[in-house]
Amino acid sequence: MMSRFLIPVAIAGLLTACASTTPTYYTLQASTSTAVAAPVAQAWKGFQLRRMDVPAQLDRRSFVLTQSTGGQVNLLNDSQWASPLPDEMSLALVSGLQDRLGVPQLAGAAAKTPYWQIDVLVQRFESVYGERATLELSWALSPVGFEAKTRQCRWLDSEPAASVPELVQAHRQLQQRWADALAAQMQGKPVPVNLSKAMLCAS
């Protein structure tokens, strides 16, 4: 972990570099080398991500850094997401679920096609320079066209990280762990213990 006395100096250096460097672009999507799961027999044929709501201050492409002391927030224009954060999170979740489930997202589901509908509300997508990345969100998983219980859950997970590239990688890992838990939930499988610790669902 970076010394708290050095963090403001390091951030100042990053902000100074912003004015003179070409932006570096990052994505939340995992490597395409992940093997796609074979679809299994099930009552539903796909899923639809209906909503991905992100706090207004994060609805941007610039990387948002939070200082560990004082709560100061800095925008890094030289470190940007490849698309606005809500789109990055949506693309990462959709591709992650497709890889794990072997079924497509149904953007315009045909009549009588059974699918899972997903609504996500992001409370926190935090990058604390020199310390950690944190993801906090809630979601509703609703069956459409088939019989199943609607799930309403909350997720809070963190991953240690220091530099901007490390924070990006940490956010990718958090996104992948959440996709693992959500995919297990959709398949009616037990969520692994290491993931269930970050998860709280309404009974």
List each model region and its residues.
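Structured segments of extracytoplasmic/periplasmic soluble domains
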Residues: 55, 92-103, 177, 181-189
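A structural "domain/chain start" motif
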Residues: 18-82, 190-203
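Sec-dependent bacterial lipoprotein signal peptides
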Residues: 1-18
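Short secondary-structure boundary motifs at beta->alpha junctions and helix caps
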Residues: 72-80, 146-184
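Surface-exposed short loop/turn segments
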Residues: 19-38, 43, 99-146
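Mid-chain, structured segments of secreted extracytoplasmic proteins
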Residues: 71-102
